A protein has these predicted regions:
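Short hydrophobic beta-strand segments that form the core of ligand-binding sensory/regulatory domains
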Residues: 83, 135, 206
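ATP-binding/phosphotransfer module of carbohydrate and carboxylate kinases, centering on a glycine-rich
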Residues: 1-66, 71-107, 113-130, 168, ...
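Glycine/GP-enriched mid-protein hinge/lid loop-to-helix segment characteristic of carbohydrate kinases
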Residues: 174-261
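Glycine-rich phosphate-binding loop and adjoining helix at the ATP-binding site
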Residues: 102-123, 127-187, 192, 230
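Short, ordered coil/turn segments that flank beta-strands lining enzyme active or ligand-binding pockets
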Residues: 98-99, 143, 209-210
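Structural motif
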Residues: 86, 137-140, 198
Length: 267
């Protein structure tokens, strides 16, 4: 029985993955996509429809008047993601549906960000029982959910925030560099791409190469602010000085030159 239940869970996951492109699918379409047997697909699709995870679209008639096969689509409101963008003095909180549409937004001012305060923010937001995943973006370098250095938020340095969140709330969690989270949203739509952010603490960047985010060995990729702008100062040092007496066009141009010579993105 345990093995049978495990196989069913695997097949269910495979079928759900066939909907992640948000296309309309008949049971025959799903059978072709997944290479599962039609009886297996039919039974699990019916269960998913009853559980409101997918929706059956209204019956349609073919051109000859005959009944067409029912089509199914993912219920975009079945599951929400709780997304936190953590900065030095505030936390932005988004709840998004499966179609990446904003359900709600909040900005919480905090003078001293810490893991405890992040957990409290999450606790107030997961009262919505549709939240099935948590994503936290941190400025700095993060590896496997462990924060090596949080830019301007020293209290988070060395914190295994991913594990702390999962252990407290038992919800699938991802903690990563904020720019890496941003670029991952374009993974399916674009080819090689570089995203650049110019902030108070210096520039950051993230990349997709050959359709996949560049993660690096220890999460330090994209920290271009530590590169030298000239023989005396880094890009980050100039930012911390308030970009005084700096031609921003030249600043961005030099930054782009470093990125292009390494990544050579399409966009």
């Amino acid at each position: 029985m345990a093995f049978s239940s495990m196989v069913k869970d695997i097949n269910r996951k495979i079928i759900l993955e066939s909907f992640w492109d948000f296309s309309r699918n008949t049971k025959q379409d799903i059978t072709k996509k997944t290479e599962l047997s039609f009886p297996t697909v039919s039974k699990l699709v019916d269960e998913l429809n009853e559980q409101d995870i997918i929706h059956m679209l209204s019956d349609k008639r073919g051109e000859t008047g005959g009944r067409k096969a029912n089509e199914y689509i993912l219920n975009q409101e079945y599951a929400y993601s709780l997304c936190l963008k953590v900065e030095r003095e505030y936390i932005e909180v988004f709840i998004v549906d499966l179609y990446k549409q904003n359900i709600s937004y909040d900005k919480i001012e905090e003078k001293a960000i810490s893991a405890e305060k992040i957990l409290k923010v999450i606790e107030t937001k997961i009262l919505n029982n549709k939240i099935k995943s948590i994503v936290v973006g941190i400025p700095g370098f993060i590896h496997d959910g462990i924060i090596g250095m949080a830019d301007g938020i020293e209290a988070l340095n060395g914190c295994n925030l991913k594990t702390e969140i999962f252990q407290k709330f038992n919800i699938e969690t991802e903690v990563a560099n904020n720019m890496n989270i941003l670029v991952s949203g374009f993974q399916k739509e674009l080819g090689d791409i570089s995203c650049i952010h110019i902030g108070k603490n210096g520039p950051g960047s993230s990349y997709i190469v050959n359709g996949k985010p560049v993660s690096g060995a220890f999460g330090f990729q994209g920290e271009v602010g530590f590169n030298f702008y000239d023989e005396h100062r880094t890009f980050r040092e100039i930012a911390l000085e308030g970009y005084q007496n700096i031609d921003m066009i030249e600043y961005i141009g030099r930054l782009l030159l470093q990125i292009i010579t390494v990544i050579n993105p399409y966009k």
